[in-house]
């Protein structure tokens, strides 16, 4: 048992996050995303939505402050400017964790799949809101 560690953060997940370096990507993806296709480790957060996962992850995971866009979201096909409730929850968690407004960039769905190829690891949530897939670039502490 550890003090001051979010209860969703398991030992294997903390180990993965610790091994990530500055600039590495973490995928925070919904239940429909084909995370296992990429060959990166996949941490199962079934039953956890995007907001809950973001609150846990961002309690220990610094976002990159040296780039304009440390978070990318998958666009909704045919409605690229639409912001889902899941994205709103991620935005709230990111802003709170970083103590500043965090810009979430929009990426077309197929471009997002390509952008996810070098991901270090995925956190596969049980999020039911479609297109709730995000890439988070790790910063420094």
What is the predicted role of each segment?
Residues 1, 5, 45-49, 78-82, ...:
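Catalytic cores of large soluble enzymes that bind and process phosphate-bearing ligands
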Residues 24-27, 41-42, 64-73, 101-103, ...:
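Structural motif
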Residues 39-71:
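A phosphate-binding glycine/aspartate-rich beta-alpha loop in the early core of alpha/beta enzymes
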Residues 4, 64-66, 136-141:
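Conserved phosphate- and dinucleotide-binding cores of soluble alpha/beta proteins
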Residues 1-46:
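Long, hydrophobic N-terminal alpha-helical segment
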Residues 78-141:
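Glycine-rich, aromatic-bearing surface loops/beta-hairpins
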